[in-house]
């Protein structure tokens, strides 16, 4: 994003000069910053990233099929004893790798989206209600927990997390305790 902004700013100072560039300068970078921020948010959103990859995947598949057809036609001509007048044909394996790389990216996006969704469901399941806020005393929140119940729920979640952490530490110590003995015997 910084590179995009740095590339866009020098033409403004050259075109605008002294006072005119100063009046136009602050408005344009803010718009570019907002555009850059939106692009960053889209990059982090797996669903948006997936949607952006679909046209690339279609193009890659079309290119792959075109190269496969060209290679097949060239091989057929060679098998029939005819010389190919087309010249060098693109490599099928490179376009296949490009296609698979895009498929892998899309798979990762879908897995990430699924993970985000399952975390959202788990969050709603384990903390389904909100605590009433002091900033909105007039608003009646029927599904909210009293603060004391919320505190007890959070304390139980922290206790559970500590138990899991301690169990993982014990397992790690057991594994580390066994590892030097096996290495020393080799």
From Swiss-Prot:
Localization (cell): Nucleus
Family annotation (PANTHER family): MEDIATOR OF RNA POLYMERASE II TRANSCRIPTION SUBUNIT 29 (PTHR28314:SF1)
GO cellular component labels: mediator complex
Keywords: Activator, Nucleus, Transcription, Transcription regulation
Protein family: Belongs to the Mediator complex subunit 29 family.
Domain of life: Eukaryota
Single Gene Ontology MF annotation: transcription coregulator activity
Pfam families: Med29 (PF11568)
Main location class: nucleus
Biased composition (Low complexity): 25-41
Assembly mode: Component of the Mediator complex.
Record function comment: Component of the Mediator complex, a coactivator involved in the regulated transcription of nearly all RNA polymerase II-dependent genes. Mediator functions as a bridge to convey information from gene-specific regulatory proteins to the basal RNA polymerase II transcription machinery. Mediator is recruited to promoters by direct interactions with regulatory proteins and serves as a scaffold for the assembly of a functional preinitiation complex with RNA polymerase II and the general transcription factors.
UniProt protein name: Mediator of RNA polymerase II transcription subunit 29
Organism encoding this protein: Xenopus laevis
Record-level GO BP terms: regulation of transcription by RNA polymerase II
Region (Disordered): 1-41
InterPro entries xref list: Mediator_Med29_met
Biased composition (Polar residues): 1-12
Gene behind the chain: med29
């Amino acid at each position: 994003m910084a590179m995009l902004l740095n590339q866009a700013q020098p033409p403004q100072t050259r075109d605008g000069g002294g006072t005119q560039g100063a009046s136009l300068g602050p408005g344009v970078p803010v718009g570019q910053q907002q555009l850059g921020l939106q692009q960053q948010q889209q990059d982090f959103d797996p669903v948006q990233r997936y949607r952006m990859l679909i046209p690339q995947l279609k193009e890659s598949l079309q290119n792959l099929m075109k190269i496969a057809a060209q290679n097949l036609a060239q091989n057929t001509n060679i098998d029939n004893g005819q010389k190919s007048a087309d010249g060098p044909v693109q490599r099928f394996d490179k376009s296949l790798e490009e296609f698979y790389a895009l498929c892998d990216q899309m798979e990762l996006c879908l897995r990430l989206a699924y993970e985000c969704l399952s975390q959202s469901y788990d969050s709603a399941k384990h903390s389904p209600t909100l605590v009433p806020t002091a900033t909105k005393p007039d608003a009646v929140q029927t599904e909210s927990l009293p603060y004391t119940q919320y505190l007890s729920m959070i304390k139980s979640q922290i206790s559970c997390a500590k138990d899991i952490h301690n169990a993982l530490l014990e397992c790690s110590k057991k594994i580390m305790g066994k590892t030097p003995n096996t290495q020393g015997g080799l």
